[in-house]
Design a protein with these regions (language model features):
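Positively charged n-region of N-terminal signal peptides that target proteins for export
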Residues: 1-6
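Hydrophobic membrane-insertion alpha-helices, especially the h-region
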Residues: 7-27
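Solenoid-repeat scaffolds in large eukaryotic assemblies
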Residues: 48-49
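Extracytoplasmic/periplasmic/luminal assembly and interaction segments
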Residues: 52-98
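Structured, soluble extracytoplasmic/luminal domains of envelope-associated proteins
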Residues: 78-135
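Short beta-strand edge/turn micro-motifs at domain boundaries
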Residues: 119-189
Length: 189
């Protein structure tokens, strides 16, 4: 084989290796994960959503934030509701995950013991009227990243910016775990 052919083959191998490295590096960035979350929401791909969003953590944190806002608004009934939410956090979060799965799979919602608290919290948070419109920015700090996401509330006809905390696991996979400014969003809403 001539030196020119060997150099050409070596060059092609180097280019393929560099392209592979860039691709696999990109797959392990919070920007890629945020794009996959948006893709999962748009295509109703529950498996991809569950891979990139720790739904149990997100819902548990949302319940905590809701209970905190309710308990501090000064109304006695809201303090009682907040206390009830906190005590039932785990089963309500599990039910929210289950309902998300059913919604993404296009299945009919099943009746549950927790229908009333789940409906109350989703209505209170306005989750059913929200759409993700744009990923605005990503600030990566070690094994955590804060992704600013613009969401649109169809009922209020208003845009909000959520600060979503993403964490990297031991395998290098980025996963959304919490909406950092959910309390601010609830107060605005």
């Amino acid at each position: 084989m001539s030196k020119l052919k060997k150099a050409g083959i070596l060059f092609a191998i180097l280019i393929a290796g560099a392209a592979s490295w860039v691709y696999f590096y990109w797959m392990n960035t919070p920007a890629y994960a945020a794009g996959e979350i948006q893709k999962a929401v748009q295509s109703h791909d529950y498996d991809l959503l569950a891979y990139r969003v720790d739904l149990n953590k997100v819902y548990s944190a949302a319940i905590d934030d809701s209970a905190d806002v309710l308990s501090k608004d000064g109304e006695k009934d809201h303090r009682t509701a907040a206390s009830l939410l906190r005590s039932l956090k785990s089963p309500i979060a599990d039910e929210l995950v289950h309902q998300t799965q059913l919604r993404f799979q296009g299945k009919k919602k099943e009746s549950s013991l927790f229908d009333e608290p789940v409906n109350a919290i989703t209505s209170y948070l306005g989750f059913t009227t929200l759409t993700i419109t744009q990923c605005l920015s990503i600030e990566e700090k070690g094994d955590q990243a804060i992704v600013s996401v613009r969401v649109h509330d169809r009922k209020l006809k208003h845009d909000f910016t959520w600060k979503v905390l993403m964490e990297k696991d031991v395998n290098g996979t980025w996963c959304a775990t919490r909406i950092l400014n959910l309390k601010d969003y609830m107060r605005e809403r």
